[in-house]
């Protein structure tokens, strides 16, 4: 049997030694970000994505190993463990295969087969299966025993049949093969329930629908499961030949027949055996297989949905920061007014206000004047506008503010406000902004997330940020674990200024956690900013191991040691000293000197502890200490006069922002309160496997309007801007129509009605836009 490390190595395409080293480090309490960045020699430079996969597979395979041990102990206790069975259990490479093998030995409720065996009917069953020339009724007469509850030959045959049915249904190899045959050839079939045609309209694409199981994309799987859960759809699995007439077995029944030597050759027991196979298939085997495939289909779709959510969250967290610029945050609304908050370049709140420029009060000029005064008073450079209800009207308000104050040279940006209301009412917001009304905290969050999306969004439960595909239909624990890993990797990829970071941001740093993060903030508040990384050791609860895990990701931009603002780990400072000695230079002269550093050979400074990969990273950090891997900040410009879906016309070319990436395409905010959909087939001239190959959440893109369905609130977009020149019809071949669907009846793009959450109902994305 292959070791866990070898299995993972084969899956990753890595050496077993690399995996073994990574496993040892993980077991030793080291974090994925730390291992990926500072233990490259040990792992052969496995990156964070590979390490996350390794970590996940390690957990699965260890669970499988433990379950395998439990199964062996259970079967041994029953006195039924044979060398062949032990070998089969050892070779089981999935939990499903292991459970198939264990099924005949699993403790179960009293069954008809067990009762029949206790009545002594096992020999009858074996005789009829082994010698079909036996006449069933005649053989059964010898097993009639009223004292055992077998009063007739028919009762004896019924008991023998129950024994064989259980045997057929618990054959691990047979069930595994039938399951795979059904998976490859089977279909999911959805029908609308009677009387649900109107109330279940959002699932109308699935009212009469079928699709091959193995080809179903995750969003359609979760859509039909949700329709079934909401009692709009009936969902069934079907395969050709699963139902057949008595005496004419279909392919699945024939597979059972072949496995146990049953055939129709005119012998006395043949018809009885064929009916036994038929009953076994229809009442037990098929039922179990369909339950297994339902679970498999959901798990596969769930895995894909979680992956989409994680990818979108990563893109959002690593979106370009506007940086330290005074920002006015506007949380739009009608009746309750537009909430405004000004934060200075450090994110500190310096002013809040509520204005009522829109219906029903329409105090437009007063709002322009008061907000202009705030901008001038606090030197505002950016205006961040939440993208919820009244966003476009508030955008016009901001435009007028800019026009009235040209000397301030301000810019306005529309910002996703998803999750801002959750933050406003959270314990974190109460702790950060105790004197601020809940209604103004959302405006603060909108302003800050423009300055630094990562620093602000870590304060919000990722599930509330609204970039997930069917996030409410997947397993909570699996989703949370994946998203937590994304947040941790993003924060550590960027690094954290230990003197300005909030507690929630520090909590995501490798090795820290909420408790130590709060202690760092308390120590900073009581003693002033940290001057060196070494000073972190004075924080209560921050021991040697925690310091080792965290120090490289914590930055001190204006500290005593220039290295403390870089990603060079303190443990590697001796390497830098050797470089300084060799170059006869001072750190303040060498750091940032790209020309001088690029003349150095990493191999010249490597030793037994710090190899070439680490030295190469050190030199790169010295070139650009504390470099931010996030892209440069830029904004989309919405077209004037295009403010609602009715303003759109096919052929328009517009600029927009990608708000969400799903398996079937990307949603783009083009400024009309309704995101449009760029289907995966309309993203590029070449065939692509995933929309994420082309776009990510937050990207500014230019799109072509293909079609607009105002009543259904559907907007079809294309990123192939020359489609219009071809009559909006892409060429045949590898680039199907933007609205192309699978050959079998399948749903069109999800209906887009209302706010983003409603727009993405069928795509499973939740993103509430607040009023």
Predicted regions and their residues:
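Long, charged amphipathic helices and adjacent flexible linkers at domain junctions
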Residues: 292-301, 305-310, 464-495, 604-650
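Accessory alpha-helical DNA-binding modules that contact the DNA backbone or grooves
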Residues: 31-32, 47-147, 493-632, 639, ...
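Single-stranded RNA-binding regions, centering on S1/OB-family and related RNA-binding modules
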Residues: 554-771
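A glycine-rich phosphate-binding loop feature that marks nucleotide/adenosyl-phosphate handling sites
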Residues: 180-187, 330-334, 388-390, 414-422, ...
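C-terminal accessory/binding modules appended to enzymatic or scaffolding proteins
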Residues: 13, 320-322, 488-522, 640-678, ...
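Long, charge-rich intrinsically disordered scaffolds of nucleic-acid metabolism proteins
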Residues: 84, 97, 101, 413, ...
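Duplex nucleic acid-engaging cores and interfaces of nucleic-acid transaction enzymes
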Residues: 34, 50-53, 60-329, 333-424, ...
